[in-house]
Amino acid sequence: DREAAKIIASLYRTELVEADGNPDMVQVLSPYRVNTEAGVHALNKQLREIANPASVKAEQWNAGSWTFRIGDKVMQTKNVDNISNGDIGRVVQISRKKDGNRQMQVDFGDEKRMYQEEDLEDLEFAYATSVHKSQGAEYPVVILPVLKCFYPMLRRDIYYTGITRAKTRVHLVGSKSALAIAISRTNIGMRNTMLAERIRAEAKRQEYVPQTKAA
């Protein structure tokens, strides 16, 4: 998974340049959140430094294990006020209140929310997100790891969901053998549909399938 993570970062950098630096145009999806370098948490650390590197001029907020910067792409992780679990926004302001404590404003498009320090646990970076969290969303470009170390999550429905989030192109990072496993496996009790054929068709449409030793 380490080699796959490197390839994902390289693809992300290339696609970000093509998107004029707009991270909303490129989304990395992973079936796993933790316990792998190709999971959501580990990938976010890499991708954030590509999309929004530290700058001496840019305001940032060190809060525990998190460091937020102006321009960061973040996701709300629970329902609150008019912001829903899974909503993605951008950090637009980091400031200090009169009492000296910091606060941070996130723009979600239709809504803006001001976060205090105790609210930050409701946020996580969103350069990479889980396939599950991506349901109902669409992105011009999707990058999706498909590795044998993901075996419990190598399922037809999961990868069909991930692949079909892409409006323009999708990059599958891993191996064709891992993809074959995903196509052959489905949820217990899931109806017999045309998902296998559709996922093969979507995979054929992709621009590039890099092979990795991690697969």
Regions found by a protein language model. Give the residues of each.
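C-terminal accessory regions
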Residues: D87-A215
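Conserved helicase motor core of P-loop NTPases
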Residues: D1-N82, V92-I94, E202, V209-K213
